[in-house]
């Protein structure tokens, strides 16, 4: 029943929180505990040959009459074994080509925190509604073998939206998205008597070899985007169409004392 309710709330799957008045607005809440284990080498080398995930998540919706509010929280502890070719960033698959790699298989200990909320007004004049969505993601990741890394990744995203109800069958919406991206990556060696080899990747198969305890990297980025929605609904039929466009730019600097752009 819970999954069916969430599936039928079409606007909750869109990028516009202002569509909440058009969905089923009955209150609900749930808590989920999870455990996942993956073992084997049929994977990308950065993913590790063994992965265990323990997590807890919760979400809920409440109708406050003067506002509709939804919120969710997720925490996951992710342990990787025998992961390679990454020595600097929490997620080597997020589209950032400039990071540090090494050839030593290592364990990783990662923690993920996700906070989300949506809030919307009831319809003004039986036509207009305003909404706001917010997402905050924090990731702590630590490589367990020299050259080690302690990296902190953060994302804060806000998405205001507006909807217009023409009649019972036709609704229109528009939303704008802004995200701020930040990652602080600091490499080091526990065994200071043995220098380690590492490679500074520049993308397109280009890399520079380094020897020592690694580098400190500072990643800063922004994302802008927007989306348009159209909803056609009847008692026995409900259709939501959405088109979106995002632009993301991210830079990386090595060292805080003498910053060097990559």
Describe the residue ranges of each PLM region.
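Residues that define the transmembrane beta-barrel architecture of outer-membrane proteins
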Residues: 50-56, 109-115, 152-156, 220-226, ...
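Outer-membrane beta-barrel proteins
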Residues: 38-53, 104-108, 140-153, 215-219
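Outer-envelope beta-barrel architecture signal
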Residues: 25-29, 65-71, 126-130, 168-172, ...
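Outer-membrane beta-barrel translocator domains and adjoining extracellular loop/strand segments
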Residues: 41-46, 82-88, 141-149, 185-191, ...
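N-terminal, post-signal peptide beta-strand-biased segments of exported outer-membrane/organellar beta-barrel
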Residues: 1-83
């Amino acid at each position: 029943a819970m999954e069916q309710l969430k599936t039928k709330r079409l606007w909750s799957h869109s990028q516009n929180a202002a569509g909440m008045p058009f969905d089923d607005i009955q209150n609900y809440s749930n808590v989920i505990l999870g455990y996942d284990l993956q073992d084997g080498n049929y994977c990308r080398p950065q993913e590790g040959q063994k992965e265990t995930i323990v997590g807890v998540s919760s979400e809920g919706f409440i109708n406050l009459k003067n506002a509709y509010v939804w919120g969710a929280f997720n925490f996951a502890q992710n342990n990787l074994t025998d992961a390679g070719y990454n020595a600097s960033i929490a997620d080597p698959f997020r589209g950032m080509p400039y990071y540090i790699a090494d050839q030593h298989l290592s364990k990783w200990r990662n923690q993920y925190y996700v906070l989300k909320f949506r809030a919307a007004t009831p319809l003004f004049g039986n036509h207009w509604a305003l909404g706001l969505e917010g997402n905050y993601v924090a990731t702590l990741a630590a490589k367990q073998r020299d050259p080690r890394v302690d990296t902190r990744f953060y994302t804060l995203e806000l998405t205001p939206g507006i909807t217009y109800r023409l009649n019972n069958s036709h609704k229109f919406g528009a939303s704008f998205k802004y995200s701020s991206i930040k990652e602080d990556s600091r490499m080091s060696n526990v065994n200071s008597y043995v220098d380690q080899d590492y490679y500074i990747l520049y993308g397109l198969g280009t890399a520079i070899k380094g020897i020592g305890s690694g580098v400190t990297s500072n990643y800063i980025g922004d994302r802008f985007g927007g989306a348009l929605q159209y909803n056609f609904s009847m008692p026995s039929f409900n259709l939501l169409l959405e088109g979106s466009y995002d632009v993301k730019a991210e830079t990386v600097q090595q060292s805080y004392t003498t910053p060097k752009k990559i």
